[in-house]
Amino acid sequence: DFKRIRYPVHVILTALSMFYLGKNSFRNIALILRTVMNVLVSHTTISNWCTNFAPMFQNMALQLIPALNFNSDEWHADETVVKIQGKKYYLWLILDSETRFVLGFHLDRHRDSPQAFTILEAVKDLGSPRAIVSDRYFAYQMPVKTLHGVQHIRVESFHDDITNNLIECFNKQFKAWYKTKQGFSSFSSANNLISMFIF
């Protein structure tokens, strides 16, 4: 709720933009705000903004979903690694080929079929693609067949006509942003910050 915040909304949005679109730490953002905008705000406060406003912006993004058409040619599935308190977690993602919208994500300690089932189950009511594209990792085979009943295209980046480059490019953008964060402090914080970046 912006009403309880003592800083102007444009300052908060500027800080959020620098964090999610740039490669700035909370301390750097505080320094930039002080130098450029003459606004004194602590790095801790900026961190709290990023964590607390993530659910609000995610809800706003979710409200847009019914107006979008995800019955596209392909949905792309992939997973990438993040660290939470130094421990390895897998970020599972589904991306629509036409809108470039991330349909959903799932954060888990494991990388196996149950996690693929979880993410594909979460997005199955959003539309009906003609095919779901993934790499050749076996975990997607049964969930795609069972939950969606569409063609499953398993690709190797350099050998197939259809590639998974779309979601791999997204993962590169995510990794560039994530690298500046040096991992996440908690599972809850990771979910909030990732959802803010995605949505």
What are these regions (language model features)?
Residues 40, 48-70:
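Short, basic alpha-helical nucleic acid-contact segments in DNA-binding proteins
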